[in-house]
C-alpha cells in the first residue's frame, strides 16, 4: 500500500525521510538550545504555503506573535501576505490576550494550562483555514510543571490535529548535552522523532540531524551534517557525521543508499501529483 507523504521541501530533509513525512503524522522535533528546531518548523510551514499552497498554523507558546513574524522574515519568509489571505495564522498562546498587539490576534489562548482551551482554539483555526500543516513551539512548555501529564497532553493535541487531516511538527526542548526527547512517554505518543544536535569537538561546533523513528516510513539510519544558512536549514543528506573521542569526520553515504533516497523523493512527488490530478477530474 502506497503511503501518502507531505513534502517538507527543506533541502535534504525529504531525502532522509525517503520521500517526506507520512500524512497526518505528528513529528517531535527535539534538541537543545540553538540547534535549529524552531527554524525547521517555520521552514516546514513556509514551504507548504509557497510550494503547495497549503495553509498552515503556528502555535506560539514561547514567542510573542510579533517576534514570530520577525523570525520568519529573518530568512526572507514573508508570511504576512498569507496571513492576510487567510492561509496562515498564529495561535497566540503566549500573551494570554494582554497588550494591544495581542488583542489583534484572532486565535488567542488565555489559559495556557488549559489544554482543552488550546485544543478548542486550534480546532477552530484548522477548520477556518482548512489547514494542512501545524507547528507547536514548543510543546514541552505545556508540561514543564507537570511532566507526568506529558503523554496525555500530546495525545489530546494529536487527536485534534491528525483527526482534522493535518501533518504536524511538535518542537520539544531538551537541555544541552541531554540525549532524551523531552517529556516522559512523549516519544511513544508521537509518530516520528527527529533529533537536532550541536556537538563540540576541538573547539569547533558541528550541527547534525538524525531521524530516530517515523511511522509508516523507511528512514536514514545515520546522523547527517546540517547547516543553518541565510535561507534556512540545509541538510547534507548524502553524507554522514561521525564524532568519536579521537576525531570528527564527514563521509559520503554509499552510492546505492543515495540513489534509493533520490528515487523515493521522486516517487513521492509523482504519487502526490497523480492523486491531485484525479481529484481535479472528479470535480
Swiss-Prot record:
Keywords: ATP-binding, Nucleotide-binding. GO terms for molecular function: ATP binding. Pfam families: ATPase. Disulfide bonds: none annotated. Residues 261-283 are annotated as: Disordered. Residues 4-249 form the KaiC domain. Residues 267-283 have a biased composition (Acidic residues). Transmembrane segments: none annotated. ATP binds at residues 31-38. The keyword Cytoplasm does not apply. SUPFAM superfamilies: P-loop containing nucleoside triphosphate hydrolases (SSF52540). The keyword Nucleotide-binding applies. Belongs to the UPF0273 family. NCBIfam families: thermo_KaiC_1. HAMAP family: UPF0273 (MF_01076). This is UPF0273 protein STK_18300. It comes from Sulfurisphaera tokodaii (strain DSM 16993 / JCM 10545 / NBRC 100140 / 7).
Amino acid at each position: 500500500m502506497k503511503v501518502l507523504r507531505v513534502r517538507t521541501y527543506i533541502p535534504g530533509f525529504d531525502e532522509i525521510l525517503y520521500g517526506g513525512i507520512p500524512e497526518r503524522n505528528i513529528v517531535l522535533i527535539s534538541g537543545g538550545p540553538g540547534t535549529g528546531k524552531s527554524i525547521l518548523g517555520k521552514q516546514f510551514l513556509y514551504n507548504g504555503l509557497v510550494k503547495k499552497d497549503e495553509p498552515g498554523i503556528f502555535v506560539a507558546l514561547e514567542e510573542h506573535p510579533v517576534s514570530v513574524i520577525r523570525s520568519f522574515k529573518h530568512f526572507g519568509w514573508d508570511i504576512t501576505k498569507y496571513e492576510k489571505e487567510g492561509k496562515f495564522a498564529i495561535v497566540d498562546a503566549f500573551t494570554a490576550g494582554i497588550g494591544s498587539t495581542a488583542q489583534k490576534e484572532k486565535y488567542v489562548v488565555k489559559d495556557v494550562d488549559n489544554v482543552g482551551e488550546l485544543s478548542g482554539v486550534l480546532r477552530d483555526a484548522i477548520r477556518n483555514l482548512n489547514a494542512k500543516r501545524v507547528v507547536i513551539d514548543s510543546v514541552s512548555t505545556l508540561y514543564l510543571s507537570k511532566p507526568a501529564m506529558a503523554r496525555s497532553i500530546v495525545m489530546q493535541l494529536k487527536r485534534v490535529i491528525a483527526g482534522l487531516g493535518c501533518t504536524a511538527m511538535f518542537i520539544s526542548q531538551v537541555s544541552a548535552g541531554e540525549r532524551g526527547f523531552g517529556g516522559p512517554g512523549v516519544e511513544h505518543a508521537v509518530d516520528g522523532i527527529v533529533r537536532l544536535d550541536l556537538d563540540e569537538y576541538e573547539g569547533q561546533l558541528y550541527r547534525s540531524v538524525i531521524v530516530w523513528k517515523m511511522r509508516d516510513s523507511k528512514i536514514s539510519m545515520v546522523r547527517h551534517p546540517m547547516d543553518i544558512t541565510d535561507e534556512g536549514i540545509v541538510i547534507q543528506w548524502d553524507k554522514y557525521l561521525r564524532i568519536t573521542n579521537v576525531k570528527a569526520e564527514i563521509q559520503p553515504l554509499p552510492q546505492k543508499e543515495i540513489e534509493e533516497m533520490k528515487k523515493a523523493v521522486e516517487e513521492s512527488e509523482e504519487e502526490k501529483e497523480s492523486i491531485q490530478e484525479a481529484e481535479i477530474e472528479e470535480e
